[in-house]
Design a protein with these regions (language model features):
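Short coil-to-beta transition motif at edge beta-strands of beta-rich domains
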Residues: 34-52
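Aromatic- and Lys/Arg-enriched surface recognition patch
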Residues: 56-131
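Compositionally biased, low-complexity repeat tracts
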Residues: 8, 21, 46, 57-59, ...
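Short, flexible loop/turn elements at secondary-structure junctions
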Residues: 13, 48-50, 66-67
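Compositionally biased, charged N-terminal/linker segments
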Residues: 1-40, 113-114, 119-131
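Structured loops at beta-to-helix junctions and adjacent beta-edge loops in soluble globular domains
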Residues: 10-12, 47, 78
């Protein structure tokens, strides 16, 4: 079994059925970034842009990838006990991942890989609310 990979999934304003809410467990990344290399067991930091009113500029939870195609990623949504702010990401992402994160202004539904350490830096001091 391969080690999981870690990603930031950027969510803009949810507009089903093409763009879903983070709690739905379905993510439709911008197709121009396909193919998506996610595999079951990979982890997503679910970041909401300023246009996502309910969770603006925050990471309210993580996703564990269940399956991925060229148009959508299905995941198990797990809320965090305390959301992570954009400032938390700016402070805790490693330099290479922070440089990628600065490019979110180009797409409100962008998916990009980050290091395991960056992922842990964000979630380490927060609990995951298991159902």
């Amino acid at each position: 079994m391969n080690a999981p990979k870690y990603y930031i999934a950027v969510f803009g304003d949810p507009k089903p059925p093409e763009k879903d809410a983070i709690e739905s467990g379905v993510y439709h990344p911008d197709i121009k970034f396909a193919p998506f290399r996610n595999k079951p067991g990979d982890f997503l930091l679910l970041y909401c842009t300023g246009s996502y009113a309910e969770h603006a500029m925050r990471v309210p939870g993580i996703g564990v990838v269940l399956e991925a195609t060229n148009s959508e990623i299905r995941y198990r949504y797990l809320p965090l006990s305390e959301t992570a702010s954009k400032n938390d990401l700016d402070d805790k992402l490693d330099p290479a991942d922070k440089a990628k994160f600065l490019n979110i202004r180009f797409s409100s539904h962008w998916l990009f890989e980050i290091s395991r350490q960056s992922f842990l830096n964000i979630v380490a001091d927060r609990g995951v609310l298991w159902p």
